[in-house]
Amino acid sequence: MYHCPMYSSELIKGTLKTIVLKLLSENQEMYGYEITQKVKDLTAGKIQITEGALYPSLHALENEGLLSTQTMNIGKRVRKYYSLTKKGKSVAQEKISELTDFMNTMRFLLDLKPSAQ
């Protein structure tokens, strides 16, 4: 049986925006490092998002009007929180549905049996 300790960056890159949108739809607002740690925790370390991958995606989602930002001073640090806009909430659902359908198609294509969870 194949065991992958961490998924390839190519696989993650294609789903990163959807991952971010999904997390923000469940958590209202999050800051960048919090997003990376949440993904790492939820996937038992199989998906580790680097800052170099995350922040360009966050900025792209913000430029697309899907995210809004708010900065807060935490001690001597400035922390930037991201949250979904109304449009972002709608697009999040579309992206999640699209990815779910894609995974089901890949499962069929590769003749895989659904995993028991």
Q: Where in the sequence are the language-model features?
A:
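Basic, amphipathic "hinge/linker" alpha-helix immediately C-terminal to the N-terminal HTH DNA-binding motif
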Residues: 77-96
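Amphipathic alpha-helical dimerization/coiled-coil segments
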Residues: 2-3, 90-117
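N-terminal helix-turn-helix DNA-binding core of bacterial DNA-binding proteins
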Residues: 10-53
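Basic amphipathic alpha-helical segments that dock to polyanions
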Residues: 54-61
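Short, Lys/Arg-enriched N-terminal segment that forms or immediately precedes the first helix
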Residues: 1-9
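Short, contiguous hydrophobic alpha-helices characteristic of membrane insertion segments
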Residues: 9-10, 58, 66, 116-117
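Beta-hairpin "wing" of winged helix-turn-helix
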Residues: 62-78, 83
